[in-house]
């Protein structure tokens, strides 16, 4: 374990600020390191435009499986054209190291808003944000694309507009892969419910019970409760986004 960590520190060190890649993209700062990629904020020095650049980690670049996975992510992003998903811009290889560039989305992610800024969201605000997120999921699922990592750090809000980022675990399936479609669909639905739960808890002022559940702690309308129960698999799971949309609309009506 210690040797593995040492290798990461030695070989997966982020690029230095100011480095220019492909004679075009200047590294401004490292935004983070994921399971197999390093993510940077960069500037296109030709267009003077900020972008996000992703690099396959050097320790992963030596493995064919990881290189294929990185190329699959690029291929997937090229097929996605949605205003609330960062668009693909460019790709290149330097000294055997793969990179790709995508749009930079301004704003703050929900994790920052909830846990660092302690921003409260009313039931209506929470449901309206989930409505936007569902629209993105509808777009993806219609194309048999499953995000598989819908979490608060991967959801950015800018002036009330929601965007979904980080498609590192996403996968596009074929109609024949019915079992995997079912599993991945439910994973996205569960993540949607969990995100809603986080948002609803932002206004919770009571003292959390040691073994208390959200059903005991939160005061919700029956429509919102049903929506959450089905998304989280407590009651009959949703099979399609259309059914979620129907119940979500009822939930919104119940709090307005």
From Swiss-Prot:
Residues 25-256 form the Protein kinase domain. The active site is at residue 149. The keyword ATP-binding applies. Pfam families: Pkinase. GO terms for molecular function: ATP binding; protein serine kinase activity; protein serine/threonine kinase activity. ATP binds at residues 31-39, 54. Keywords: ATP-binding, Kinase, Nucleotide-binding, Serine/threonine-protein kinase, Transferase. Belongs to the protein kinase superfamily. Ser/Thr protein kinase family. This is Probable serine/threonine-protein kinase YbdM. The gene is ybdM.
């Amino acid at each position: 374990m210690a040797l593995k960590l040492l290798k990461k520190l030695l070989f997966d060190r982020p690029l230095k600020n100011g480095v220019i890649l492909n004679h075009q993209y200047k590294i401004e700062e490292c935004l983070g390191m994921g399971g197999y990629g390093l993510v940077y904020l960069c500037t296109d020095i030709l267009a003077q435009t900020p972008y996000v650049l992703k690099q396959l980690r050097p320790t992963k670049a030596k493995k064919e499986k990881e290189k294929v996975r990185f190329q699959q992510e690029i291929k997937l992003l090229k097929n996605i054209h949605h205003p609330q998903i960062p668009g693909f811009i460019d790709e290149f290889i330097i000294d055997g190291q793969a990179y790709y560039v995508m749009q930079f989305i301004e704003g703050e992610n929900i994790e920052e808003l909830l846990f660092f800024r302690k921003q409260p969201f009313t039931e209506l605000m929470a449901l309206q944000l989930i409505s936007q997120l569902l629209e993105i999921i509808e777009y993806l699922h219609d194309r048999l694309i499953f995000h598989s990592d819908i979490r608060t750090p991967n959801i950015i809000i800018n002036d009330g507009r929601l965007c979904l980022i980080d498609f590192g675990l996403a996968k596009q399936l074929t109609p024949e892969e019915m079992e995997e479609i079912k599993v991945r669909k439910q994973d996205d639905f569960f993540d949607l419910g969990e995100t809603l739960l986080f948002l609803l808890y932002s206004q919770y002022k009571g003292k959390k019970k040691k073994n208390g559940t959200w059903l005991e702690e939160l005061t919700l309308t029956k429509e919102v409760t049903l929506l959450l129960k089905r998304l989280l698999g407590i009651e009959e799971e949703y099979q399609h986004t259309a059914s979620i949309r129907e119940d979500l609309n009822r939930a919104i009506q119940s709090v307005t």
